[in-house]
Design a protein with these regions (language model features):
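Anion-binding alpha/beta catalytic cores of soluble intermediary-metabolism enzymes, centered on
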Residues: 1-52, 56-239, 244-308
């Protein structure tokens, strides 16, 4: 049942990457071979100028092994997750870098540094995670949010989650993404809180709290992505069956959804944290190199857009 098809970096991202200026990017926890291999790929492709943060001796040793030239690269010699994460965030807060890549540090450590009220990267929005999903052989991009950071977001938080995902879609060239707010069904049911909350989100969005998109819901997943399902169920909506962004009610749905696409369909899940002062590349240890590379390109695109 598991797919053995190779993972693919979306061609359109590779094309966009050709025209990008290098993005200065802090690598939080660069003292790891897998991380440095990703850094080498993105550096040689002209996507980033990395600032390597971690144990300098290990960084130099591993760089020699994988063939990463560090002579012209800045290395910040630090150990310990808190110190490494804090240094990456400090570089972003001072505008020394325009993006952060999570390397060999735990997500919690990096996120704690990013949301620190005194020294972090807070903006007026809630920080949230967006998966950029693509399937080999298909052109359609689907953004899934939030499957990694916010566990059980309330309606106000989900409004920011939606705004952050819309920003990603805009940066990638979709000026009016179709946003589907997910639940277990398309009918509002008081015994299904996500449907009630979904209806509230749509009502507030239509009153002007969210713009730059077409938004509808609550929808079950089939209605969000399948034109045939929408037709059979008689749903008349410009979003039904055409969603570019799906907004999940909780982390369990988002995490399960993206992993099913990865393992059953060889979907490439490029993870980005939005809502902070800079985009943060957030991938897991189980992710293929292609996912980290795609996420790095996306972060560079977003960072470039924020600086123009």
């Amino acid at each position: 049942m598991l797919s053995d098809a190779p993972f693919e970096v979306p061609p359109y991202l590779l094309e966009k990457a050709k025209h990008l200026p290098r993005c200065p990017m802090a690598i939080a926890g660069a003292d790891n071979e897998v991380v440095l291999a990703s850094v080498r790929q993105a550096t040689e492709a002209g996507i980033i100028t990395p600032v390597l943060i971690g144990d300098a001796d290990i960084i130099h040793s591993l760089s020699d092994v994988i063939g990463l030239k560090t002579d012209d690269l800045e290395i910040v010699d630090l150990t310990g997750e808190e110190a490494v994460s804090g240094a990456a965030v400090s570089l972003a807060a001072s505008n020394s870098v325009k993006g952060i890549m999570k390397g060999h540090v735990h997500t919690d450590a990096l996120m704690r540094a990013a949301v620190n009220r005194d020294t972090g990267l807070r903006t007026g929005r809630r920080i949230s995670h967006v998966f950029h999903m693509t399937i080999p052989g298909r052109d359609k991009v689907l953004l899934i949010t939030d499957g990694a950071v916010n566990v059980a977001p309330n309606v106000d938080t989900r409004m920011d989650i939606i705004r952050n995902a819309i920003d990603v879609a805009h940066a990638l060239g979709n000026p009016e993404p179709k946003v589907a707010v997910l639940s277990g069904a398309e009918v509002v049911n008081p015994s299904m809180p996500s449907s009630v909350e979904g209806a509230e989100i749509i009502d507030r969005a239509r009153k002007g709290e969210i713009d730059g998109c077409l938004i509808d819901g609550p929808f079950a997943f089939d209605l969000a992505v399948s034109p045939e399902a929408a037709k059979i169920k008689g749903i008349d909506s410009p979003v039904a069956g055409q969603a570019d962004i799906v907004v999940v009610p909780n982390i369990e749905m988002g995490n399960g959804l993206f992993k099913m696409m990865v393992y059953f369909m060889s979907g490439l899940a490029a993870g980005i944290v939005m809502g902070a002062k800079v985009p943060i590349v957030l991938t897991s240890r189980a992710d293929p190199p292609e996912a980290r590379f795609a996420a790095t390109i996306i972060a560079a695109i977003i960072a470039h857009g924020d600086s123009t």
